[in-house]
């Protein structure tokens, strides 16, 4: 999985490519845990994400909980197959998806 970070002012955009699974989710979790304290909005751009496992969902849920305390989070560029997973798991009711 590739993780690209772009920070503009208080907005951190994390673009993901590849698979977010048991092997790769710790890298995303580390990036989120180590983000600057002044970040008030987190944008997860998952246009290039091909697959997400329960471990990946856990990291996204953890990020949402963290951002609820300090700002906001949204998920953008969600493909149909991952949107279906978000719908089945109820994540559509938890996340802001654009």
Language-model-detected regions and their locations in the chain:
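Short leucine-rich amphipathic alpha-helices used at interfaces
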Residues: 2-3, 34
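STAS-typified acidic loop motif
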Residues: 3-28
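Amphipathic alpha-helical interaction surfaces in cytosolic regulatory modules
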Residues: 22-94
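Short acidic-hydrophobic, aromatic-tinged amphipathic segments that line or gate anion-handling sites
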Residues: 96-98
């Amino acid at each position: 999985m590739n993780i690209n970070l772009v920070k503009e002012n208080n907005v951190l955009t994390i673009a993901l490519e590849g698979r977010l699974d048991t092997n790769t989710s710790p890298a995303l979790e580390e990036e989120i845990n180590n983000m600057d304290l002044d970040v008030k909005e987190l944008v997860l751009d998952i246009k290039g994400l091909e697959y997400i496992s329960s471990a990946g969902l856990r990291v996204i849920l953890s990020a949402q909980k963290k951002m609820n305390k300090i700002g906001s989070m949204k998920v953008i560029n969600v493909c149909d197959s991952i949107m279906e997973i978000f719908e089945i798991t109820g994540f559509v009711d938890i996340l802001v998806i654009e």
